[in-house]
């Protein structure tokens, strides 16, 4: 498993853009427990776009190599040590999020990073002029690679998803369209945390993403923070399912009790040996209110039931 972490004593706050690092853990089965193995992408210096912080992993395999896609940031000034950071500084660093890739010959080998982002924001005439983040990748059998990413045009504007394509997994990526892949008439319909895969049998691009609706909007699913499903023939024109909700913030545990989680972030699917979705993983934590974690955060694994 590839995930991200930072020191518990720092609290949650905005440390996912200041103090996060990507790690690797191992387990004998999908449900765990997982044992920490090593840090994959530590800090490497302020001169790099990802030199101070790495987060939001997406691991893929193709033709003998492992491709680890991620979001990175760099920033000047002091490294936050648990104190509250100003909204102005948070926004400055948030706007420096960029997608990168690191490549290894073995899942246990050295992951080598690029010096430059895999995909950068465009100029201010476009909807994705602020950031590129939350990478979701599908590699087709011939190596053609589709990259779904999150961005927005300004503070308070809708979070939306775009798509870029390359002839090989490490680029060069070019956007498929000037417009986002999902857009809504209601400005309170925000989407983020995509997970993308290609169903070769059905020749469909499949998308799982988080309903991040704002201002009390019912959003796509009717439940903030839940996940919805959409699919496409070309990874550009997506149709949201008639029954879109894939997962909820309500969890039913093996001992029979139910909890409402504050967050279910960064959905990730593990496939079985036949290529069918098997387990859904999400980042979560203790506490019922969004982003108000009480004590600890963790990763949840849920066995999937296909309909």
Q: Language-model features: where?
A:
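Carbohydrate-active catalytic/glycan-binding domains of CAZyme proteins
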Residues: 1-307
């Amino acid at each position: 498993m590839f995930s991200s972490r930072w020191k518990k004593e720092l609290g949650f706050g905005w440390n996912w853009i200041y103090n996060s690092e990507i790690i690797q853990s191992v387990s004998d089965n999908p449900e765990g427990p997982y044992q920490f193995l090593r840090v994959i992408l530590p800090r490497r210096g302020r001169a790099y776009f990802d030199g101070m912080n790495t987060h939001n992993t997406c691991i893929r395999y193709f033709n003998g190599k492992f491709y680890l896609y991620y979001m990175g940031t760099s920033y000047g000034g002091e490294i936050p040590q648990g104190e509250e950071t100003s909204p102005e500084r948070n926004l400055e660093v948030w706007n420096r999020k960029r997608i990168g890739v690191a490549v290894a010959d073995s899942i246990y080998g050295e992951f080598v990073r690029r010096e430059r982002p895999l995909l950068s924001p465009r100029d201010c005439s476009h909807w994705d002029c602020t950031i590129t983040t939350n990478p979701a990748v599908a590699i087709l059998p011939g190596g053609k690679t589709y990259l779904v990413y999150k961005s927005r045009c300004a503070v308070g504007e809708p979070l939306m998803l775009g798509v870029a394509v390359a002839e090989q997994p490490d680029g060069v990526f070019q956007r498929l369209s000037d417009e986002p892949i999902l857009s809504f008439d209601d400005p309170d319909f925000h989407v983020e945390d995509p997970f993308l895969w290609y169903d070769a049998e059905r020749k469909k691009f499949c998308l799982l993403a988080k309903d991040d609706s704002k201002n009390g909007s019912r959003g796509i699913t009717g439940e903030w923070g839940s996940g919805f499903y959409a699919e496409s023939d070309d990874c550009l024109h997506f149709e949201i399912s008639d029954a879109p909700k894939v997962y909820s913030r309500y969890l039913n545990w093996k001992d029979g009790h139910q909890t409402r989680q504050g967050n279910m972030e960064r959905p990730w699917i593990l496939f079985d040996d036949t290529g069918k979705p098997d387990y859904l993983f999400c980042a979560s934590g203790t506490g019922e209110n969004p982003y108000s974690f009480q004590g600890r955060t963790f990763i949840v694994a849920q066995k999937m039931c296909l309909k």
